[in-house]
From Swiss-Prot:
Plant non-specific lipid-transfer proteins transfer phospholipids as well as galactolipids across membranes. May play a role in wax or cutin deposition in the cell walls of expanding epidermal cells and certain secretory tissues. This is Non-specific lipid-transfer protein 1. One of its GO terms (molecular function) is lipid binding. It holds the Pfam family Tryp_alpha_amyl. Coiled coil: none annotated. It comes from the Eukaryota. Keywords: Allergen, Disulfide bond, Lipid-binding, Transport. The lineage of its organism: Eukaryota, Viridiplantae, Streptophyta, Embryophyta, Tracheophyta. InterPro entries: Bifun_inhib/LTP/seed_sf (IPR036312), Bifunc_inhib/LTP/seed_store (IPR016140), Plant_nsLTP (IPR000528). PROSITE patterns: PLANT_LTP.
Length: 91
């Protein structure tokens, strides 16, 4: 999995993580796609690192909104989407 794949899948989520409100269906589809692409521990760690980079590079991200995304979409992501997540511990 590449950061390009992660960022293109999660582009529809940017307005939600900045401003809240309803999560767009395209955003949930993107989270599902990333989760399905990240099948191995190495892929999950790579996706985690990409998410950390993305959340740090987008101004105005609300960390609570970012962390709530998987639950709001009904997707089980095995780590918290947060700039402080230690991706090395992701299994």
């Amino acid at each position: 999995i590449t950061c390009g794949q992660v960022s293109s899948n999660l582009a529809p989520c940017i307005n939600y993580v900045k401003g809240g409100g309803a999560v767009p269906p395209a955003c949930c589809n993107g989270i599902r796609n990333v989760n399905n692409l990240a099948r191995t521990t190495a892929d999950r760690r790579a996706a985690c690192n990409c998410l950390k980079q993305l959340s740090g590079s987008i101004p105005g991200v609300n960390p609570n909104n970012a962390a709530a995304l998987p639950g709001k979409c009904g997707v089980n992501v095995p780590y918290k989407i947060s700039a402080s997540t230690n991706c090395a511990t992701v299994k």
